[in-house]
Amino acid sequence: MEFDTIAAISTPPGEGAIAIIRLSGPEAIQIADRIFYAKNSLSEAESHTIHYGHIKEDGEVIEEVMVTVMRAPRTFTREDVVEINAHGGIVSVNRVLQLLLRNGANLAEPGEFTKRAFLNGRIDLSQAEAVMDLIRAKTDRAMGVAIRQMDGNLSRLIRNLRQEILDALAQVEVNIDYPEYDDVEEMTQRMLLEKTELVRASVEQLLQTASQGKILREGLATAIIGRPNVGKSSLLNQLIQEEKAIVTDIAGTTRDIIEEYVNVRGVPLRLIDTAGIRETEDIVEKIGVERSRKALADADFILLVLNQNEELTVEDEALFEAAAGHNYVVVLNKTDLETKLDIDRVRELAGENPIVSTSLVNDEGLEALEEAIKTLFFAGDIDAGDATYVSNVRHIALLHQALEALNGVTTGIQLGMPVDIVQIDMTRAWDLLGEITGDSVQDELLDQLFNQFCLGK
């Protein structure tokens, strides 16, 4: 497959040490050579070499650059690729790009370089999606999962499962078309059932990693809830190590939702500091309280903050009811003051959920809280070096659909349905798994996926 030659700025816009303009396509080297001036021509350069020179426009030097030449097929796109390393900035870099476009290159669409890598067989679709996961990774663990997926861990597993299904379908066809025994139908059903159970077990095992994988990829929507002035904003500031929320002794200071990402021992949290939940006549505060209730309902995880220096109130107990059904940690704050809280009642309300004591003004208890969060979600098993995690929502949905199709095969065999009918569900499972790797996928989906990438990627 051959495309036109595309160009784009691959580094973020703005001032910086360097900026990279990337070209890919059959004319990439020739187009770059038209504007690059040095001792030797780029057209004669060997692959994977770097060259110093200048970019000129109408005889005027507009940039001093280093140019990398990479010839097909040993490139990311499997096309000729040129990367121009210029000084970071806006004006000169855009002039270089415009010069390339005037000399025959077309401006790349978002994600077009990665899309070409997929279409040219350099990577499959799950590996292409992992590129974006790596870019967006917020923790070392999320980065590790993305790198393993880019390396083909998930692809190899899916392809092995598809091969198992294909082998079974081929055997079904042989047994139907060339029966040698009277009991061929029974033998075929038994073989098909064994293969189905094998593939189904693997799909179920993959889906068991989905919850942790999704956490790593997207982060946990974490609502910090509690009555006014119990220390919610102090907790947010301590976790992100930055003064984002106003902290005062005046109840009701936080009137809107504040969101921040933080990495807590490998667990990515999207922290949501909510307005204190209480009955109020203040119109503005009332809006904040309603938003807090919605944030609580939508949260994946809750940090329920109580003031250890005050007695438990009806409003506090109502928060436990609202948190029911969620994963949550109870934070008993202000341990530097006299304890007035009924701790036994708190333990009764919290049930199996962890309870951590803190004195945020004295920086005490934060490590214990971070450890409780890590243990609650990962319990250490996420660290397996070669583990394959499913984190992409699209992949998870396709695996669930494939599992449903495989269950249909099992049910059909158990009901005594003919194998040529049962194999329809088997073929559907094969197709669905193929959508994960891109072996069977619609062009519209490809456009939708790659448009999520930035320009130059």
Curated annotation (Swiss-Prot):
Annotated keywords: Cytoplasm, GTP-binding, Hydrolase, Magnesium, Metal-binding, Nucleotide-binding, Potassium, tRNA processing
Position of the signal peptide: none
Sorted alphabetically, which SUPFAM superfamilies does this protein's record hold? P-loop containing nucleoside triphosphate hydrolases, TrmE connector domain
Compartments, as annotated in UniProt:
Cytoplasm
- Ranges where the TrmE-type G domain occurs: 219-378
Q: List, alphabetically, the InterPro entries matched.
A: G_TrmE, GTP-bd, GTP-bd_TrmE_N, GTPase_MnmE, MnmE_dom2, MnmE_helical, P-loop_NTPase, Small_GTP-bd
UniProt cofactor(s): K(+)
Which residues make up the binding site for Mg(2+)? S233, T254
Give the source's domain of life in one word.
Bacteria
One of its GO biological process terms is: tRNA wobble uridine modification
EC number(s) recorded for this UniProt protein: 3.6.-.-
Residues engaged in binding GTP:
229-234, 248-254, 273-276
Q: Which residues bind K(+)?
A: N229, T248, I250, T253
Q: Name one GO molecular function term.
A: metal ion binding
Q: What does this protein do?
A: Exhibits a very high intrinsic GTPase hydrolysis rate. Involved in the addition of a carboxymethylaminomethyl (cmnm) group at the wobble position (U34) of certain tRNAs, forming tRNA-cmnm(5)s(2)U34.
Oligomeric and partner information: Homodimer. Heterotetramer of two MnmE and two MnmG subunits.
- What HAMAP family has UniProt attached to this entry? GTPase_MnmE
Annotated PANTHER family: TRNA MODIFICATION GTPASE GTPBP3 (PTHR42714), TRNA MODIFICATION GTPASE GTPBP3, MITOCHONDRIAL (PTHR42714:SF2)
What name is this protein filed under?
tRNA modification GTPase MnmE
